[in-house]
Regions:
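Extreme N-terminal basic, low-complexity initiation segments
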Residues: 1-15
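Active-site rim/loop-helix segments in enzyme catalytic domains that contact anionic ligands
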Residues: 39, 46-164, 306
Length: 311
């Protein structure tokens, strides 16, 4: 597939190189490996902050285009795959960014990290096809040692300014401990705060990484952030029609899921628990941050969401 397909759904006409090479990590390597898929074309929120019998209102706002930013292959499928598939089925275009290729994601010390990374990239491509993303980028940062530094933020700003999403889905950077039952992986935390920092202020500030603007990647304002795996969720997306597709996408990650039926049962249970909060079969929850909103689109529900300071 050529460069024309890569620009599907983009607002800008700036060309972008397509990287189709398999993973070949070397220290200090930078630059995304974008793998486009030939599917899909490019399209509103309801959030009720009032608790009545613990029942929330389903969140219905939908972006024309959105980007999911995660630390590893499989994070997006354990995370917002149901939301992504639901939005894509309704007409949105989604792009997935994996900061690492998961080369440290194994329990066998004799496993070749490069071979594992190649396998996990291919697993993620298969899963992304199931969900329906336009494409996926691998930034080839070191698994287990991801750092929110300027090079990573520049790569993420490049991704955002290229695809120009209305919404970005990423981890909640405030979460170090999940409730009282688990520690949030260091790469998840680094990817989350890097994504937030890339969205605001860097992606929207033409003075940040000015060489990007000079190369044709104009500043871009992401309108909303959806923070997954949050300890403070305040919106729930109905993913009932896409729950099976989320499980199908997870099946692609054979190198990471050694008890698939047990894992899938827990995932379905979690979606069902979240769905009960809004009266549907399955849902995924987020902490919503509204960065920019057109006045005519504002609803009572959205008015309750935190709004970041404008640049």
């Amino acid at each position: 597939m050529g460069g024309d397909e890569r620009s599907l759904g983009r607002h800008d006409n700036a060309p972008r190189r397509i990287w189709n090479q398999p993973f070949a990590w070397c220290p200090g390597r930078a630059g995304p490996a974008a793998v486009p898929f030939d599917n899909g074309v490019l399209g509103e929120t309801g959030r009720n902050s009032d608790m009545t019998d613990d029942r929330q209102t389903a969140h219905t706002w939908r972006p024309d285009r959105f980007m999911v930013i995660v630390g590893h292959p499989d994070d997006a499928d354990f995370g917002p795959a149901g939301t992504a598939a639901t939005w894509i089925d309704a007409g949105s275009a989604g792009w997935l960014v994996c900061c690492t290729s998961g080369d440290a994601g194994g329990e066998d010390p004799d496993l070749d990290p490069l071979e594992l990374a190649r396998a996990r990239e291919e697993e993620q491509r298969q899963a992304a096809t199931v969900v329906g993303y336009v494409g996926v980028s691998f930034l080839h940062q070191p698994d287990g040692n991801l750092v929110n530094d300027l090079p990573l933020r520049e790569m993420l700003v490049r991704e955002i300014r290229t695809f120009r999403p209305d919404a970005v889905l990423c981890g909640d950077p405030d979460v170090v401990i999940h409730g009282n039952s688990g520690i949030n992986h260091t790469d998840h935390r680094a990817a989350a705060i890097a994504a937030v920092d890339a969205v605001y202020p860097a992606a929207r500030n033409p003075m940040a990484f000015p060489w990007l603007a000079k190369s044709g990647l104009a500043a871009h304002k992401v309108r909303r952030l959806y923070l997954m795996w949050s300890n403070q969720p305040d919106v729930w997306v109905d993913v009932s029609a896409a729950a099976d597709r989320k499980i199908e996408a997870l099946r692609s990650h054979a190198s990471q899921i050694h008890d698939p039926e047990g894992v899938f049962t827990r995932i379905r249970g979690r979606m069902s628990e979240q769905g009960e909060l809004i009266g549907v079969a399955a849902a995924e929850s987020y902490r919503l941050v509204v960065l920019d909103q057109d006045p005519e689109e504002e609803t009572t529900a959205d008015a309750a969401a935190p709004v970041a300071k404008r640049s």
